[in-house]
């Protein structure tokens, strides 16, 4: 099945594409993104083959998918957060047509706040002296879980998550000090990734959720994401003459194109 991809290449004369200064804890949409949102809504309504209306029903789908994309296993949001977001559940369609993007940014900022609370818990409060002889149960599938009401309940859920990960390392004959270091390093890397999110990343995430709500084969690509997609599809960077492969979280040079810049620099 063909995949519908929306490419938006817009030049704004004299207008910065992003906010001048974005606080790490609070990201906000830009005027440019508001304009793009209205444009995407119009393009999807007019040209998508499904001819789906942007209405309350679609709004509920977008809401559920967006919240799930941030916290699919219910590890971060509290029940009060989700209840507070409910006022947007039937209104995202109208917001999209108007280019009003504050709600998805509010949801993301709350997610990042809750995420940081979890990282603080792992770093400063969690004791790694787990009793592996005690019978405990950890539900993995978020569909089988409810959002918890208090941070204390979330702490206990996370204690079991980390205990499960520690047990995996234990079965691999890792020492206790090594286990603690490896787990903290894992979440430090994740925290760095989340901390580096910019306004454009939140916009990309939300707009892609919106496009996929029309059908799973529709996507929104910003200009930067479009270029990255082309690179991934070709698995090469023509500019440097190198072919790349992925090795876990690292990118490796698989081969160098003869005669290219990378080859000449050898």
Model-derived features: positions:
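Sec-dependent N-terminal signal peptides
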Residues: 4-13
């Amino acid at each position: 099945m063909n995949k519908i991809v929306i490419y938006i290449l817009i030049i704004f004369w004299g207008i910065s594409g992003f906010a001048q200064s974005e606080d790490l804890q609070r990201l906000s949409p830009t005027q440019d993104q508001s304009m793009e949102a209205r444009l995407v809504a119009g393009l999807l309504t007019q040209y998508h083959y499904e001819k789906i209306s942007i209405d309350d029903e679609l709004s509920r789908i977008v809401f559920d998918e967006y919240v799930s994309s941030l916290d699919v296993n219910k590890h971060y949001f509290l029940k009060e957060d989700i209840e507070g977001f409910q006022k947007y559940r039937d209104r995202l369609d109208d917001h999209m047509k108007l280019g009003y993007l504050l709600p998805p940014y509010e949801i993301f900022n709350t997610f990042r706040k809750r995420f940081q609370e979890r990282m603080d818990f792992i770093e400063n409060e969690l004791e790694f002296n787990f009793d592996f002889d005690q019978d405990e149960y950890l539900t993995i599938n978020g569909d089988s879980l409810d959002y918890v009401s208090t941070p204390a309940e979330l702490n206990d859920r996370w204690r079991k998550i980390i205990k499960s990960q520690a047990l995996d390392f234990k079965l691999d004959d890792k020492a206790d000090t090594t286990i603690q270091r490896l787990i903290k390093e894992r979440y430090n890397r994740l925290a760095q990734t989340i901390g580096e999110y910019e306004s454009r990343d939140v916009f990309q995430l939300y707009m892609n959720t919106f496009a996929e709500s029309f059908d799973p084969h529709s996507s929104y690509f910003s200009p930067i994401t479009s270029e990255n997609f082309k690179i991934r599809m070709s698995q090469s960077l023509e500019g440097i003459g190198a072919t790349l492969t992925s090795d876990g979280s690292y990118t490796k040079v698989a081969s160098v194109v003869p005669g290219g810049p990378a080859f000449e620099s050898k």
